[in-house]
Amino acid sequence: MQGSVTEFLKPRLVDIEQISSTHAKVILEPLERGFGHTLGNALRRILLSSMPGYAVTEVEIDGVLHEYSSKEGVQEDIIEVLLNLKGLAVKVQNKDNVFLTLSKSGIGPVVAADITHDGDVEIVNPDHVICHLTDENASINMRIRVQRGRGYVPASSRVHSLDEERPIGRLLVDACYSPVDRIAYNVQAARVEQRTDLDKLVIELETNGTIEPEEAIRRAATILAEQLDAFVDLRDVRQPEVKEEKPEFDPILLRPVDDLELTVRSANCLKAETIHYIGDLVQRTEVELLKTPNLGKKSLTEIKDVLVSRGLSLGMRLENWPPASIAED
């Protein structure tokens, strides 16, 4: 194996051991040391908590008002019936919400195969027992709601999201949407040529039958990759502050000296010196103005007082004066 010591080994799928239709082992190697646990733990958490699936969320049973009751002719109490309904493994095509019905009478077990549904729904475990009827005259009728979701959502967390006037007899069920029943991984030693410090990741996975183990791992890896995409293209996404453009010069500096309302004598003296704008005037010093013909100390005092009243003074320095708008004039 040639290459730079800084290059990471890229793992490959070595084997998929199909133990049953719902149980498989997936083996990947070689992994850099430590990456077996890094990837194995991340995939395990996603497979257990973040895989989408379908679960029973509500049930209505004829003659039953609440879950802490029993039904005549049914061996199990209602809480046990609800627990059994949680074990239904359902596949639904192109729908997020479906209703199923179950009607059964006579002695014997009531199983998932007794549920009536349309062509978009498949009961993966038809032999799953829901309850037992103990009398020839006994019967049970129920309406089952199945919804798509992710992870585990207890019934208590959905109470406030439902209509305030929830009909009496509508029983809420803790929803376990994840199609993964069990996931475990272990990291073994691997070797590539002279390197013996590598990892081999073995993932053992069992599902409820609504998804194949290999497909479950593929989806989990896709979820992980999508979450990491943001780090691949990491950059400052904060919007730059929009700063208000301040004018280069105080607007008063761009006004003509006539706006100062000086005496005619003072105004004429300034015009004779080609001082047309207040910005031109404030850059002159007292000494420079006193050299202006016919402009004496009285006129100078008048000019200084007018400028002070406007927050200005003589001898100011203005960078980049005159502005383009004045220079063009």
UniProtKB/Swiss-Prot annotation:
Catalyzed reactions per annotation = RNA(n) + a ribonucleoside 5'-triphosphate = RNA(n+1) + diphosphate
Q: Which residue spans traverse the membrane? A: none
The enzyme's E.C. designation = 2.7.7.6
Record InterPro entries: DNA-dir_RNA_pol_insert, DNA-dir_RNA_pol_RpoA/D/Rpb3, DNA-dir_RpoA, RBP11-like, RNAP_asu_C, RNApol_insert_sf
Report the GO molecular function annotations. Answer: DNA binding; DNA-directed RNA polymerase activity; protein dimerization activity
SUPFAM superfamilies reported in the protein's UniProt record:
C-terminal domain of RNA polymerase alpha subunit, Insert subdomain of RNA polymerase alpha subunit, RBP11-like subunits of RNA polymerase
Listed A to Z, the keywords are: DNA-directed RNA polymerase, Nucleotidyltransferase, Transcription, Transferase
Task: Please tell me one Gene Ontology term that the record gives under cellular component.
Answer: cytoplasm
Q: Gene3D superfamilies this protein is in?
A: 5' to 3' exonuclease, C-terminal subdomain (1.10.150.20), DNA-directed RNA polymerase, insert domain (2.170.120.12), RNA polymerase, RBP11-like subunit (3.30.1360.10)
Q: List the residue ranges of the region (Alpha N-terminal domain (alpha-NTD)).
A: 1-235
- Show the segment(s) annotated as Alpha C-terminal domain (alpha-CTD): 249-329
Q: Which GO terms describe its biological process?
A: DNA-templated transcription
Give the domain section of the comments. The N-terminal domain is essential for RNAP assembly and basal transcription, whereas the C-terminal domain is involved in interaction with transcriptional regulators and with upstream promoter elements.
- Assembly notes: Homodimer. The RNAP catalytic core consists of 2 alpha, 1 beta, 1 beta' and 1 omega subunit. When a sigma factor is associated with the core the holoenzyme is formed, which can initiate transcription.
Q: Which family does it belong to?
A: Belongs to the RNA polymerase alpha chain family.
Q: What does this protein do?
A: DNA-dependent RNA polymerase catalyzes the transcription of DNA into RNA using the four ribonucleoside triphosphates as substrates.
What this protein is called in its record is DNA-directed RNA polymerase subunit alpha
Lineage of producing organism: Bacteria, Pseudomonadati, Pseudomonadota, Gammaproteobacteria, Pasteurellales
